[in-house]
Amino acid sequence: MAKKPTQDFESTLKELEAIVSHLETGELPLEEALNEFETAVKLVQQGQERLQKAEQRIQILLNKNDQAELSDYE
């Protein structure tokens, strides 16, 4: 089976939101709900990986410019 090409972060987030909404209805049969949950877990992992890569890129860019400083978002 061919691997599904990875989506951009925004598409991943939209698909995850749709799955959550679908699951929240409580109207899915158990097996379908489990399949949706499994898909959601994979999407969360993809999203986290993308965010980590973005953070690494930001760190690299900031390290090239020693005047810039990364601070926690409040």
UniProtKB/Swiss-Prot annotation:
Gene Ontology CC: cytosol; exodeoxyribonuclease VII complex
Pfam families attached to this UniProt entry: Exonuc_VII_S
Q: What is its main location?
A: cytoplasm
Q: Which UniProt keywords apply?
A: Cytoplasm, Exonuclease, Hydrolase, Nuclease
EC number annotated for this UniProt entry: 3.1.11.6
Q: What class of enzyme is it?
A: hydrolase
Q: Which reaction does it catalyse?
A: Exonucleolytic cleavage in either 5'- to 3'- or 3'- to 5'-direction to yield nucleoside 5'-phosphates
Entry similarity comment? Belongs to the XseB family.
Question: This protein is called what?
Answer: Exodeoxyribonuclease 7 small subunit
Which organism is this entry from? Actinobacillus pleuropneumoniae serotype 5b (strain L20)
List the taxonomic lineage.
Bacteria, Pseudomonadati, Pseudomonadota, Gammaproteobacteria, Pasteurellales
